[in-house]
A protein has these predicted regions:
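Bacterial N-terminal signal peptides that target proteins for export
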Residues: 1-8
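Bacterial N-terminal signal peptides
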Residues: 8-15
């Protein structure tokens, strides 16, 4: 019985060491009016592929859009919501440290481009 305990502890330690650390990044709120869009952008700035979920959230905390992605190094992804969906901020659930990602929220106007942008923290 005594020999089983060190083996079990070693196995548990190995399992925990290999588990990716999840981090959540939030943006400040922006309001896309009229026909504008709200974009939740995420870029992987690390040197290995990373999994993430990009979520556009309304003022009541409800999910408006959700996108699950695996981002290669240097790759980006976006969750986009229309003004009529009442999205207000973005939540990024990422595997890794905040330093592995750059996140932002943008209001995009058709024919113009981004008219407002804020960084996630």
């Amino acid at each position: 019985m005594k020999a089983a305990l060190p083996t079990a502890l070693f196995a548990l330690g190995t399992l925990l060491a290999g588990t990716a650390r999840a981090t959540t990044i939030f943006t400040p709120p922006l309001v896309p009016g009229g026909n504008n869009l709200l974009d939740c952008y995420l870029v992987n700035v690390s040197d290995e592929p990373r999994n993430a979920t990009i979520v556009a959230v309304d003022r009541d905390g409800n999910t408006v859009k959700s996108v699950d992605v695996t981002l290669q190094p240097g790759a980006e992804a976006v969750a986009q919501a229309t003004a009529s969906e009442n999205a207000r901020y973005c939540r990024f659930e990422v595997d890794g440290k905040k330093a592995h990602f750059r996140a932002s929220i943008l209001v995009v106007q058709d024919g113009v481009g981004s008219v407002s942008a804020l960084a996630g923290q």
